Amino acid sequence: MSEEEKVKLEQEEYSADSIQVLEGLEAVRKRPSMYIGDVNTDGLHHLVYEVVDNSIDEALAGYCNHIQVCINEDNSITVRDNGRGIPTAQHAKENKSALEVVLTVLHAGGKFNKDSYKVSGGLHGVGVSCVNALSDKLVAEIYREGKIWRQEFCKGCPQGDVEIMGETDRTGTTITFKPDASIFYVTEFKYDTLATRLRELAYLNKGIRLSLTDKREVDPETNQPRHEVFYSEYGLKEFVEFIDASREKLIENTIDINTEKNGIPIEVALHYNTSFTENVFSYVNNINTKEGGTHLAGFRRGVTQTLKNYADTTGMLSKLKFDISGDDFREGLTAVISVKVQEPQFEGQTKTKLGNTEVGAAVSQAVSAALANYLEEHPKDAKAIVDKVILAATARHAARKARDLVQRKSVLSGSGLPGKLADCADNDPANCEIFLVEGDSAGGSAKQGRDRQFQAILPLRGKILNVEKAMRHRVYESDKIVMIFKALGITPGTEEDSMGVNLDKIRYHKIIIMSDADVDGAHIATLIMTLFFRHMKSVIEQGYLYIATPPLYLVKKGKEQRYCWNEEERLRLIQEWGGGKESSLHIQRYKGLGEMNPEQLWETTMAPEGRTLRQVSIENAAEADRIFSMLMGDDVPPRRQFIEQNATYATIDT
């Protein structure tokens, strides 16, 4: 078959009749959260991901290698690819153009036809029709069969038939949409959120070039908008090296696996470092499976069994006096798993847990075979890994003793609550909140200013242990950390997960970090967040962790006074009240919480009706892990580079 005949056949396979329709679109505008998760920031950005996923599907099928995303000046989004273009011919069953079917009927598209796409991305799979339904305006431009086709929509309804606008020698699809402000609470796109996802997609789909442009932000020197290109030649290998950039390597090489088992394409990259945590990130059809699933279980089984067999065969574990667990084999392991599954079955609370049993066996076999070969060919690396396993097992044994001591103390000391804790009267965790307050003096003001019915105060003197650099038993031996565990009512480690916590015993559903608005305060808050991220991640995942935002300034003019939370507010108030002259106003800079009296602290930072809390969330686990490792680890150059890049956002006291 000639190349020309092959292209013609492919065009015929992806035609109007290959678009399958499964259900209507009526409910999307009434219940948007059912389709995109929520109508806040996550749901807003999910619209972009749905459109990009369509282009990625074209790339996976081999017809697209360049995807451009642009945030326009009016906060609309344009996604452009160089694929085949959505079919525009008349759809046999629907009696309208295939383009209109794709954009107005939920679950309509080539991804539901195996002849068009073998695998398809997108968690909810609702496609661009959902984006159309939730957009004030959407314009589709199709470059296909030598012509430019265009159709415009408003709130999901076509504003006319598809029209031919001209001729072209290119192919592809361009979708421009503006989210409906009557549906979304937030309509401003975050550059960094989109950049993180596009970078992730570039690593997961090597050889595809993705770009992001922000026309809202123009460089005054070059007069060019903010722009970034994401491209990975080596895929997951580069992804793991990016995540581990600030960690010290245990072995030099990243083990790269790219194979197919039982018809399932499997890609895995893994690397060992000197840290004390396991960081494994799993994906199915480009979807981040946050809850894991059979592919993750298969990977862990493959790593554990292969390393144990090697260590037993070489006699390296013969002198160890206690058992080794699977966790020990994976301490210091960073890995990314990506599988492509034709019919994925998702389970779990957020539908991000893979349930296909056949995938687990396939991944386990692939990892076992590749890792066994690597260990045989690299005995020096194999010894370094097994030595690390022995060290991890020894530390875990010590950690269990320390953890048991924490748990036993809690039982023997009655309520087990620390003496410094000023508890609240209410016993219902859903109503209660606890402030983790920097310093005893600020803790005193907070105790006096709080509402004793539902607000508890735990003062923390000085900095807590940096858990990023500490072995697990050191964490459980730290008095300050034990005090936090006891105050929250939870104990580290469960039967199912040594790194888990018994969240059903938690005493507060709002845990609020309250530290000074200076560099030391920010450092203390970061140390506490690192503790939660590494040892109580489920607290963050449940949405229980917050950061208080005390004001930076109190500005007075006569009898009038106003608080300012940042430098911009202060300058604006100087202009408004003082005509630009700071000398005509009395400005007090709060360097510490202790400088505020109890009434001021209550009014600005603690009163539910007047305060601003920032909820700590994990938008992207791999990115969060990389940043915590960089900020709190030993490697200085990446941290310096991060600070230099973000220096404009920091408030430095002199």
Language model regions located:
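GHKL-family ATPase ATP-binding module
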Residues: 1-18, 25, 47-49, 57-59, ...
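A short glycine-centered beta->alpha linker in the GHKL/HATPase_c
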Residues: 85-90
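C-terminal interaction appendages of subunits in large macromolecular complexes
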Residues: 394-413, 428-433, 444, 448-450, ...
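Conserved short strand/loop->alpha-helix "switch" segment adjacent to the catalytic nucleotide/phosphoryl-transfer site
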Residues: 30-49
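Conserved activation segment
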Residues: 25, 32-33, 99, 597
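Short adenine-binding "F-helix/F-box" segment of the Bergerat
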Residues: 91-92, 99
